[in-house]
Regions:
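Hydrophobic, lipid-facing positions within transmembrane beta-strands of outer-membrane proteins
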Residues: 177, 203-209
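Periplasmic polypeptide-binding modules associated with outer-membrane biogenesis and secretion
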Residues: 1-199
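Transmembrane beta-barrel strands of outer-membrane/channel proteins
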Residues: 193-197, 207-211, 220
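Cytosolic catalytic cores of cyclic-nucleotide second-messenger enzymes
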Residues: 228
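Structural signature of outer-membrane beta-barrel channels/translocons
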Residues: 184-186, 210-216
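Conserved small/polar residues in nucleotide/adenosyl-binding loops
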Residues: 217-224
Length: 228
């Protein structure tokens, strides 16, 4: 493994016990690739957002012992300097269109997030911040980024919802990555289920479902972003 001389190599060294490469194990390309992926994931969850598996190289020596390979892992030379820098979360900006795409835009600030929205936009007060696990100032984590995207997508109230970070060509020496979330509300489908529970001949309780009228879980008819 690389000598722990800087942030990224110290991080790699700290998890050698979790390595997928073991002395005496069979030498194969799949194991080498899996270890690259493990380290890249570790790095990207600890601020090194631009680190990639291909930035890790192996030097193999087969001359020391018969039928054995001595491996040395190194960080590839000439990779972008941004890949070796740990970032924190910067600003989180949200832009939401209403379901019609028409209306006046307004802006609110809520829990360290800036939200521009198109009126009328009816959502619960906590819907966005409670589903975004990234927070300004914390070490940037790709897992938290993916979790935020998944949480928002699973709400089922957006026609689309996209999460992007500062492009690599726009960093200009910055220590943080800004997050931009863009979305549009979907046209609400109004429905509810009426449950008719009845006893079956086999003594088990079975439901009879009747498709009916209106039910909102995340949308409120009279709560707008102005109420947040």
């Amino acid at each position: 493994y690389p000598k722990p001389t800087d942030g990224i190599t110290q991080l790699i060294d700290s998890t050698k016990a979790q390595s997928l490469l073991r002395v005496g194990a069979q030498y194969n390309a799949d194991s080498l690739s899996a270890e690259r992926t493990r380290i890249a994931t570790l790095a990207r969850n600890n601020g090194y957002y631009y680190f990639r598996p291909e930035y890790i190289e192996y030097l193999a020596d087969t001359t020391q012992e018969h039928l054995k390979v001595n491996l040395r892992m190194i960080i590839k030379k000439g990779i972008p300097t941004m890949a070796l820098k740990a970032y924190t979360v910067g600003k989180i900006d949200i832009s939401l269109q209403n379901s019609t795409g028409k209306g006046i835009w307004d802006t609110i600030y809520y829990k360290d997030m800036k939200m521009a929205y198109q009126k009328p936009l009816r959502v619960k007060q906590s819907i966005m911040p409670s589903n975004i696990t990234l927070r300004p100032g914390q070490v940037y984590s790709v897992t938290e980024q993916d979790q935020s995207q998944t949480n928002l997508s699973r709400l089922g109230i957006f026609r689309y919802i996209n999460l992007n970070v500062t492009p690599i060509d726009s960093l200009r020496g910055a220590d943080s990555l800004n997050v931009q979330i863009d979305g549009a509300m979907d046209i609400p489908l109004e429905s509810e289920f009426e449950i008719d529970v009845s006893s079956k001949s086999n003594s088990f309780i079975g439901p009879g479902m009747i498709f009916g009228a209106v039910s909102y879980t995340h949308l409120r008819a009279h709560e707008t972003c102005a109420d947040l």
